[in-house]
Amino acid sequence: MESFEKLEKLLSYSFKNKELLIEALSHPSLRQHHEYKDDKDYERLEFLGDAVLNLVITEILFRNFANYNEGNLAKIRSYLVCKETICMVGAKLTLKNYIIMTHGEEVAGGRDNLNNIENATEALIAAIYLDSNIETTHDIIEKLWAEFIKVQNLTDYDPKTALQEWAQASDHHLPIYRLIKREGASHASTFTVLVKVKDYEQTGTGHAIKEAEKNAARSLLHRLKND
């Protein structure tokens, strides 16, 4: 496990209360460990972090996407707070290297488990909020999510809906998605999905089936636009 100083440097934030940071990175498996004296883990912080993230992302979208209606804003927010996006933020922070877990959880692939990375990322947001204030937390979230927020094309946010709307407008049957390959261990699988609309088809990969479906839809939309 790497030192917390590196993580704080990536966040551009130094915790005043280091115990909050430790709690945010403590996996629930530690509660079953006889040598672990503290009963705190990241589950309660994750609950708070989820709410803080939704609030901040909603405010950012409301401010930056003035011409988008409620439905489109909801689609973008759904993309920005989904497991895949949160895990990509966690990956930028190399958060898997900092999660405190039992040896058994680590051997079982806990460091690459997307649920663990998502939960720890949300817990970290809550820890920053409790250690500072909503303004500081807002600035950190806006920085970490910047590359995802700046995407203006709704196709990139919700490619499956965009592909479905294209199919309906073109009088085609709705897109059909089929899982064609699964590789890797159960805790770190890569899925390949094939999407087909009429005579058009394209594949996409991802660490979750939904992510693979979105990537397949996005690839097919890009192909249709270039044909």
Curated annotation (Swiss-Prot):
Transmembrane segments: none annotated. The active site is at D50, E122. Keywords: Cytoplasm, Endonuclease, Hydrolase, Magnesium, Metal-binding, mRNA processing, Nuclease, RNA-binding, rRNA processing, rRNA-binding, tRNA processing. Residues 158-226 form the DRBM domain. It is found in: Cytoplasm. One of its GO terms (biological process) is rRNA processing. Its EC number is 3.1.26.3. Residues 4-133 form the RNase III domain. InterPro entries: dsRBD_dom (IPR014720), RNase_III (IPR011907), RNase_III_dom (IPR000999), RNase_III_sf (IPR036389). Its main location: cytoplasm. It catalyses: Endonucleolytic cleavage to 5'-phosphomonoester. GO terms for cellular component: cytoplasm. Digests double-stranded RNA. Involved in the processing of primary rRNA transcript to yield the immediate precursors to the large and small rRNAs (23S and 16S). Processes some mRNAs, and tRNAs when they are encoded in the rRNA operon. Processes pre-crRNA and tracrRNA of type II CRISPR loci if present in the organism. Belongs to the ribonuclease III family. HAMAP family: RNase_III (MF_00104). This is Ribonuclease 3. It comes from Rickettsia peacockii (strain Rustic). The gene is rnc.
